[in-house]
């Protein structure tokens, strides 16, 4: 791993005891020791585990929790993805949430030079509801592994609303000045970790991204459904379309069941050729998923 832009600039050599075995895709791959280490090195999560203690620190998002002792009303123009399709539907009037967070999301450029946009940071919500559950109008695509990994988001997310996009300047003195576009997003949750109902649960499902959460720490709840994506929405859509068309499957189990390759975006040359053809086809038709129409 090359460490650049740090005061200890140099090379860090990492090793593991076993050979890489899992496919390289961030949805249902990177599931072995090498893959997890690789994704930790190149991924850029919304929040990072604090090096001391069991809570979280900001990375791509900062969070301003709205302290409420009782339930909070969700604005009627907030949206929530429709189960099975991912289409963004207005929550409507009279809906209640147990918790509200206001996220400021620091955008920057992806590695190919295109800047992150609002569509990128909300697309994981759409994906979780589109691929994690069957519903009216669904494409019939369901991967049990994806359903399990996105269950917490579907259970907790009551709605979200993009409030505005701000310009943020980080001034480090001299000529070190960085400017960022910063969407402000309100996210509403169905539960709170301090609920007696949550404390009494026996299903052993992880309550947040932290395996040992502190129920009184607002950052735990903030880690459940932050508006952020490490990938451009176009890459996620390319993977979705590849899976939907039978080119590959997100997870190893589903690949075995369907008799198709486990989706590997980097090392599988044959799948790479088919993905390139598919990407060009989607580009020529200016394809956009229905859930993003109006945003891109």
Indicate where each model-derived feature is located.
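The feature preferentially marks the first beta-strand/turn patch immediately downstream
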Residues: 1-296
């Amino acid at each position: 791993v090359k460490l650049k832009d740090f005061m200890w600039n140099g090379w860090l050599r990492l090793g593991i005891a076993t050979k890489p075995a899992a496919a390289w895709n961030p949805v249902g791959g990177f599931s072995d020791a090498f893959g997890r280490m690789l994704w930790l090195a190149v991924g850029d999560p919304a929040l990072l585990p604090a090096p001391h203690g069991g809570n979280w620190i900001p990375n791509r998002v900062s969070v301003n929790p709205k302290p409420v002792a009782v339930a909070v009303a969700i604005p009627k123009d907030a949206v929530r993805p429709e189960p099975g399709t991912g289409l963004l539907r207005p929550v409507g009037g009279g809906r209640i949430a147990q918790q509200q967070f206001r996220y400021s999301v620091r955008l920057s450029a992806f590695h190919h030079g295109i800047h992150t946009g609002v569509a990128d940071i909300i697309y994981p919500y759409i994906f979780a509801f589109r691929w994690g559950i069957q519903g009216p109008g669904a494409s019939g695509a369901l991967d049990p592994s994806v359903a399990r990994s996105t269950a917490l988001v579907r259970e907790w997310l009551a709605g979200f609303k993009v409030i505005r996009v701000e310009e943020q300047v980080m001034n480090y003195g001299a000529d070190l000045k960085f400017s960022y576009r910063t969407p402000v997003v309100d996210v509403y949750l169905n539960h709170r970790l301090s609920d007696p109902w949550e404390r009494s649960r026996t299903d052993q499902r992880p309550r947040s991204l932290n395996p040992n959460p502190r129920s009184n720490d607002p950052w735990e709840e903030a880690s459940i459904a932050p508006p952020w994506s490490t990938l451009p929405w176009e890459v996620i859509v390319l993977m979705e379309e590849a899976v939907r068309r039978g080119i590959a499957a997100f997870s190893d189990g589903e690949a075995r069941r369907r008799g198709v390759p486990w989706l590997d975006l980097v090392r599988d040359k044959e799948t790479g050729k088919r993905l390139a053809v598919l990407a060009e086809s989607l580009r020529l038709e200016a394809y956009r998923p229905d859930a993003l129409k109006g945003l891109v």
